[in-house]
Amino acid sequence: NNWNPGIKDGCDSGLADALKPGMDIPYVDGRNQGGGRAGVLIAGKADKIRFEDVSMRCLYPTKTQAEVLCIRNKSDNATAFVRCRFYSQQDTLLPGGGYNWFYDCYVEGDTDFIWGGNSACLFESCEVKMITSGGRGFNARVKANNIGYVFSECSLTVAEGVTKCRLLEGSDGTGMVDNITFVNTTIDKEFFSGGINSKDKSMVPIAGYDDIR
């Protein structure tokens, strides 16, 4: 179907067909698919790619910029992830490019672990977990006229022992903004103990701040 045309500009369908449960993605079908910091890269003209029930884990050293998933496709292209799990520390997800949908997924990390610009990125019924005390969650870097990140019916949680972290390490004031919207989403109070760092003057404080558990 049109949601599974292959990866890497839609031309490497053999690689997509070679994926098997429990497989180490950098060495699919006997070939080293690595060579970069991202475990899985979706780029260029890649469109309507859908992942279901897939787990991706970063095996790079801790505190290293190494996405388990990096999306850099065209701004009007789309990807979907259903019941997927993403494990890393720094920069776990870079859902950039066009339109990205994460449904019933789990994402963990500790440093800007959901970051990058996109047209729109919807997380629906997902859990996002901070795993290290002193960490920071999001770094949006979205163009001002784009929707950016939307979290609907999600839960932002912290791992056992995490006492302080930052929800947002925001825009550096170079033209990108922190477009992040939370809808019916619960956020553990530890995410606000480290404050919100942003130079984006258009940011609106989160409503009901005092009611966050």
Model-assigned labels for residue ranges:
Residues N1-R213:
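Sequence-level preference for short, compositionally simple segments enriched
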